[in-house]
Amino acid sequence: MSYPYQKSHHQTQQPQQNGHPQHQLMLQQQQQADHSPHHHHHHHVHHATAHAYPYELGRSPLRSPQSPPLYSGKPPPPPPQSYHSYQQPPTAAHPPVSLSGAPTSMPGMMPGQQPPGMTLSLGGGGGGGGGGSAGDCFMLPPLQPQSPDGLSTVTNTSSTATNAPSARSVYPQHHQPSYPSIGSSHHPFHSPASAAALIGPSMPQHAQQQQQHQMQPHHYSSMHLLGPAGGPPSSVGPASMVGMMGPGGHGGGGVGGGAGGIAGGVGGGPGGGMGGGHNYSQSDDDSGCALEEYTWVPPGLRPDQVHLYFSAIPEDKVPYVNSIGERHRVRQLLQQLPPHDNEVRYCHSLTDEERKELKLFSAQRKREALGRGTVKQITTTLICERCGECASSGDMMVFASRFEPNTCWHPACFACCVCKELLVDLIYFHRENRLYCGRHHAETLKPRCSACDEIILADECTEAEGRAWHIKHFACFECDKQLGGQRYIMRDGKPYCLHCFDAMFAEYCDYCSEPIGVDQGQMSHDGQHWHATDQCFACSTCRCSLLGRPFLPRRGEIYCSIACSKGEPPTPSDEYAHRSSQPSHTAARSPEPLRSPERGTGRLSPPHTEHEVQSHEAASTVGSDRDHQLRSPASNGTATDNGTGTAGGGVGDSNRHRIPHRQPLDLTDLGHSLEQHWQSERTGSETISITTATATVRTQVTGPIAGANGNGPTGGGPILTSSMPELNRCLAAAGSGESPSFSGTNSPTPMPIEDSVVANGGDDADEQNQNASDASHSIKEVRFEGDFQDSLPRTKSYCQRNGGQRNRAAKSSSYASDDDELAEDETDNYHHRRHHHSHQREQQRPVDDSDARSVCSTCSSSSSSADDDVYELPLRRTSYGGTRIHYMPNNSLACARKRKQLQTSSGVAGQHYEKDNKNCIIS
């Protein structure tokens, strides 16, 4: 007959129990009195092991007067004396006992979940196995049950330190070997409130077994790892493992303690007495028992040795009650000792043949490899088997009977050689002189399925990525399609078919936004992905393919060059520099070329008939000649003169090229257009002589240069050029005696204009000689914006490096009145302008890297052309190799105003002004 547990807390038993048989009283007394440590060595096999979950021991299970007795309404008499401190520790001199039973751990148990009542099956052995039955079972209580009276619950099933007699101690327990275990009530009671509540009347053995198998199908303990008698003394199974679910889903007695399992230090060992919710708590009698602090302790140690042992283990792995270490221990029990490695009932879909093989496999492992470490305090110096360091006398070391006698480990070194985790509860497997946990030892013998985590007992399996699967389990993780012989992709250790992988993990192309399939090439950079095609993996600006080429990632885009990364095509300067580096020069079209506007005379050819006349340097014949590019609007390739005649043979026909229509640049620098000159930067400098008054500006071409350009030494024909379209408007009112101005290209291409020629169609030789006798003065520009004197509209002159690099025109400023005055002054006073360039001297002069200005900032005067034939600018070399570009205000009307003032001034003052200016040197 069975009696349900009552919710009472700590209870004692009386000899008379309201009609219950006397043998039940004796059973209760026997089972409660088995807690006394001086009886442990008689019944060490049957002691309950340490629990994996906290139990409060704030009160003694036998000293609670508030709790009524279990079977009687009589108040219990007070105990005759208080408890004494923990006395004689258990010894290791016990005969070997073989234990067998249920598995050790419960699959799927969460760390915070109360484990079920733990049922331990103990095989009949030297300690008395329950009257020769197949095995006696006992179940541990659940975690921390709460008593109705609000007092702390007490569960002390293994070792309460006391030697005092009590009302229950009428019959010595060592005279009753027929009662096999502590608290072996065999009833699947739900929530026992105290140690006394665990005691119940006995049941027939067959009823116990039947009820156990029917109502507790999942009970599991470490006893299943320890086979029947036949193993070595230390291979007796640990009595403390995970109990499984009891009836009603209530948690059982947690993960086992250290007492009663392995032979040698099992009997009477402190089996993990449960303390309060804090560490280092003390019981009511201030015994200082170390068992109250831990959920598991090594068997056979004194309290001081227990502290010494755990001090050698990392703090986060010490199984304090209600600590991280306790939860870690529970997890490691399930990890290191999988129940499906030993018990058929925890496996799925096994055939009869596989069931038999699993039983043989489990029994062989237990017989040949299973063992449990023994903790001892050494008295001599030994060397740790794992770390090789010496352990001095007094240190706690772990020994294993399956190894050599003096083989030992530090407590923190007693770990699995594969996973490097501490062997939970010191349970190890031996193979080839190495320590293994249960999981990895089984994997050394048979493969483990990566899907179901069970040992593969079949003859065939699927292996992929260095892992194994049951054939039916190797399937897509998403759609469960079997992948045997199919293509698959592993992701996070799980196989996927191609379709599911594309749907779940495919990247999207940054260019076309389409998914990149597993069969398509993929380019990736910094979290971005592209199809590995010329269309997708290309420069974001020019769309040139970047496959096999270095690329420039910028702002989430990829580019082929720095220019493209700035969002613009190569600049004209870059194009110019690139082309000028080539040995032969070709005519390059300017992005913004000039086009000479129509003159006021109306006798110019329309703009659509303009031609580009280029003088090319013959690299093989003319070594240092300059390149010339002249563009003049002409009809049928000839220049039209206004009134003095036409000369169309001034330009060689061989260097004349027709170009398409171009729009003029918006250039407004008019005032300095005839006097602003640039000197050569690299290969030579040009001497610029500017004469004013009645002198005309002419390009003197001699020697091979004239031959190259088609201009004879005497000037085959006057060619009027101007780099500024605004200059043509200034010269429009000059009358019929002035030649029209042809537009010279202000081109950033490799053929910039070097000479701006304004020629008169009359006598060329006289005008050349007239340069020395002109009474006008030449004004040279400087960077300053002061009151410099201008007497001419100025034209731009570009000096070109031998490398062909472009010089940008500098802009100067002058302040003027209006366009009409400028036109009138030009008509009255200036018919001709000449731009003099001495090419022979430039070949003999070093490179000038600076800007040549034509305005003196010191005296603001011009030199007289009557004194000098050519006013030559001295060279100046700077420390750097680049061109200095100065930008100035470009109001050209100021030039006309200042020129008018000079005309009205006295001739003497003008001559003095011109003479003062001739000695000014621009540097």
From Swiss-Prot:
InterPro entries per UniProt: LIM1_prickle, LIM2_prickle, LIM3_prickle, PET_domain, PET_prickle, Pk/Esn/Tes, Znf_LIM
A matching Pfam family: PET
Listed Polar residues bias regions: 738-748, 792-805
Predominant place of localization: membrane
Listed GO CC annotations: plasma membrane
SMART domains: LIM
GO MF, one example: zinc ion binding
Domain PET: 275-383
The name this protein goes by in its record: Protein prickle
Lineage summary: Eukaryota, Metazoa, Ecdysozoa, Arthropoda, Hexapoda
